[in-house]
Amino acid sequence: GAGVFRRFGRIRYERSKAFKDDRARYDSLTPLYQEAYNKLFDYIVSLPGCATSQVAPHYVWEYFAEDLDKMGKALAGFDASLNSNVFVAECRDNWEKEKKVQPGQPAYDFTLSDIDGKVYKLSDFRGKYVLIEFSASWCGWCKLEIPYLKTVYENTKGKNFVMFTVNMDEDREKWEKDVKEYNLPWPVVSDLKAYSGPVAQNYHVKGIPMIYLIDPEGKIMARDLRREPMIEYINKLFK
């Protein structure tokens, strides 16, 4: 039992460590990670008494909060006696929010401004693909994404494609300093409300960087895009 958790934890740690500077190792660990992830889920939901266990919802919440399919299966298996369990409530809330940000769902419309006060409204860009990257001045992983985003920007110049970075800072000075330091060629907008703002809430942003692609009809086309797969995915739109 404990071995299933240990194996998953070890692979998750190794894979996360490799993401920064060893892409080949990261890629080689991905199928092992997926296998350990699936085994962990199967182990938790098949435990005797899982349906009525006060502890099982905590594990589901901790490990599978981002997985709509697994979350739905786990919730369907929980007994009604767990309805007042705080983690079941969290899982349900999370599940409902995740459903709203799946590909094919309408993208939440927002109006945000950049540091100079120029206003951008998402629905003004209907007819174009829109990439939205959620980022922050303090986010090291986000900075690693910048070269890949710049490649996307260069590859889509002159096409019906626009990009935004939604800054997740709460401090205006930090936001302004970050904008000036990185001088990105696309708009960086913010409501300075970080995770509690309506934009982050409606896009269910719980970790960054988080990247969405919105289609010309204003629907979510893809999310969790990163690095080379993001570049390839977007290049294919214009082939």
Predicted regions and their residues:
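Conserved redox-active cysteine motifs that mediate thiol-disulfide chemistry
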Residues: R126-Y129, F134-T151
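Short, internal strand/loop/helix patches
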Residues: T111, E176-E217
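N-terminal "domain-start" segment that seeds a small globular fold
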Residues: A89-L122, W186, Y233-N235
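Generic structural signal for well-ordered beta-strand positions
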Residues: R12, K20, Y120-K121, M221
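N-terminal targeting signals for export/organelle localization
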Residues: Q34-P106
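Thiol-/selenol-based redox modules, centered on thioredoxin-like
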Residues: P216-K239
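Structural microenvironment flanking redox-active thiols in thiol-disulfide oxidoreductases
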Residues: L144-Y182, A194-Q201, E232
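A non-transmembrane, solvent-exposed segment enriched in polar/low-complexity residues
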Residues: G1-N38
